[in-house]
Amino acid sequence: MENWTNEIWVAIGIAFIVGLFIGYIIVRLTKGSVKHQAKTEAELKTVKTQLDTQKAQIEKHFAESAELFKTLINDYQKLYRHYATSSNNLLGEKDQKGLFTQQLITATDKSQNEQPRDYSEGASGLFKENKEEN
């Protein structure tokens, strides 16, 4: 070190300053990408949290819907049993039940014997005559 001249010390100083400058530029360029990467990771965590929350809400919704359907099915079964027992109690004999069935069959037979109409009563549209003019 004793043999080094001023020129070598100047060259070392310039190299040190240039190294600092290049290091500063490299840090400056990569610092933005590091910030961007950290920001992206934070956004990813936020989105994952929201997704997990939404999944939990959907699971809760379907579980609650299933319970409500079970309750609904049980209520309809109770209603059906109630109508069945009430029907047996109120109508009693099978002969009386047949009376209502026979009336229904007779009513449907009468309507089936009639020819279906494919026109409406009276004239309509362009060929309709105005009775006011006559």
UniProtKB/Swiss-Prot annotation:
The lineage of its organism: Bacteria, Pseudomonadati, Pseudomonadota, Gammaproteobacteria, Pasteurellales. Its main location: membrane. The chain crosses the membrane at residues 7-27. It is found in: Cell inner membrane. It is a single-pass membrane protein. One of its GO terms (biological process) is cell division. Involved in cell division, cell envelope biogenesis and cell shape maintenance. Residues 111-120 have a biased composition (Basic and acidic residues). Pfam families: ZapG-like. InterPro entries: ZapG-like. Keywords: Cell cycle, Cell division, Cell inner membrane, Cell membrane, Cell shape, Membrane, Transmembrane, Transmembrane helix. Residues 107-134 are annotated as: Disordered. One of its GO terms (cellular component) is plasma membrane. This is Z-ring associated protein G. The keyword S-adenosyl-L-methionine does not apply. Belongs to the ZapG family.
